[in-house]
Design a protein with these regions (language model features):
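Pair of pore-lining "gating" transmembrane helices in MFS-fold secondary transporters
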Residues: 11-32
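C-terminal ends and interior cores of transmembrane alpha-helices
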Residues: 95-109
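Intracellular juxtamembrane helix-capping segments at the cytosolic ends
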Residues: 40, 128-143, 150-151
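Extracellular/periplasmic helix-loop-helix junction of adjacent transmembrane segments
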Residues: 36-72
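Glycine-rich segments within core transmembrane alpha-helices of 12-TM secondary carriers
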Residues: 144-166
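Residue-level signature of mid-helix packing/kink "hotspots" within the transmembrane helices
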Residues: 31, 67-75, 163
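Hydrophobic core of transmembrane alpha-helices in multi-pass small-molecule transporters
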Residues: 25, 100, 113-130
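Helix-to-loop junctions at the C-terminal end of transmembrane segments
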Residues: 72-86
Length: 167
């Protein structure tokens, strides 16, 4: 439905690119995942590896799952966005992304790697995909005269999120 996507009359469209940049800075922190690999492999033995610690191989795959789910969700979420609008999709993205962190944190606390996969990989990946398409599709429609500049601002945030997300 077009009324879910197009700005109302009198709305300042230049308020959207900074908000899109902020959203993409948050979800772009996924690219800082490699910084968290070493600590995740030493949860029990902080200084030296313990027998109950996770090995690096399974921990690295969590990022891959999140990126695959991002792509799949973005493909499906784009069509869904056409029906319900970017606000609704953006709110669902925020809940998925935040919920993914909560479930993933629970998995770390309980030493259950499958919960980290489910939380950060699947649920967080869904938040990534929906959070990616919502601002970009809005900017493309609201800036037909400056599509490249408007979407570039948002995508810049996705790449810059790794700088902010890495401690």
């Amino acid at each position: 439905r077009k009324e879910n996507i197009v700005a109302p009359d009198g709305y300042n469209r230049w308020r959207v690119p900074p908000a899109s940049l902020a959203i993409h800075l948050c979800i772009g922190s996924v690219y800082a995942w490699s910084v968290f690999n070493p600590p995740l492999t030493r949860l029990q033995g902080v200084v030296a590896p313990a027998a109950s610690d996770w090995s690096l191989g399974p921990v690295v795959w969590i990022f891959s799952v999140a990126i695959v789910v991002l792509g799949l969700t973005a493909a499906v979420g784009g069509k869904w966005l056409e029906k319900v609008g970017p606000r609704y999709v953006g709110v669902v993205a925020g809940f998925c992304w935040g919920g993914g962190f909560l479930v993933g944190s629970l998995g770390i606390a309980l030493q259950q790697l499958w919960l980290v996969y489910l939380g950060y990989g699947v649920l967080g990946g869904m938040g990534l995909g929906l959070g990616y398409v919502s601002p970009v599709s809005t900017l493309i429609r609201w800036f037909p005269d400056r599509r490249g500049m408007a979407t570039g601002m948002a995508i810049m945030g996705f790449g810059g999120g790794a700088m902010i997300g890495a401690p």
